[in-house]
Amino acid sequence: ADAASYISRQPERNIRILEKYRNDKRYLSKRNFLKERSIFGLDFVFREIPNKLDVFDMKTFKEYDGRFVIVTTDAKTGKVHYFDQKDVDETFEVFCATCALPGACPPAKINGRKYYDGGLSNPIPIDKCLEDGCDKMLIVLTQPEGFIKTPRKSEKNMAKIMKLKYPAIAEELLKRCDKYNESVRLCEKLEKTGKAVILRPKYKLNSLESDTGKLR
């Protein structure tokens, strides 16, 4: 979803929002989880900010003449599902799906179905780029060179919980690390052959990094 601000020609918008609101309890906090079952304040992040506080240029976004793909995971099947800019409206529900992580945020409801973050089924959708005919790719990774994702006990425990209601998501949780590492290897292979350029930090970042200085 962060890339949307580049499509709307507002490249400074993401860091501006993070610097101003990342440590605001309305943005992300345990209090939100108690109130909404989500660590993110979904209404604040996806309704109040883009529609009032730091307005997202929906008109420019919609007029983009390329295709902007949003990657999600179908909660029932565990399969990857792709949306594009025509599916985005002022509710930003499609973007809500991109932060819907099991245990941290409920799935987003879109057209009668529920969706989780695409990172579960397709962590780095480089295969989608290749299928769509892209011959030169700019790949932005969130971890430094040499990083290998390893299973965490918390993920295994969450998979057990998710298995009761969303068994397919539970399976994807357990396969997530292998899929991520495999995707990184493919990215590096493409970089060596000149088909991709990889941008990544020199230091490790937490998934919910609160140090906005590191993010800049």
Task: Locate predicted features.
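Helix-centered, glycine/charged polyanion-binding patches within enzymatic domains
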Residues: 136-189
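Flexible, glycine/proline-enriched loop segments at strand-loop-helix junctions
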Residues: 32-40, 79-83, 113-116, 171-173
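Structural motif corresponding to alpha-helix initiation and N-cap regions
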Residues: 55, 122-123, 184
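C-terminal domain-closing interface element
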Residues: 40-63, 178-181, 198-203
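Patatin-like phospholipase
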Residues: 1-52, 84, 89-97, 138-141, ...
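Active-site gating loop/helix substructures
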Residues: 61-159
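C-terminal helical/tail subdomains of lipid-metabolizing enzymes
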Residues: 91, 183-216
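Short, hinge-like loop/turn segments at secondary-structure boundaries
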Residues: 9, 155-158, 215-216
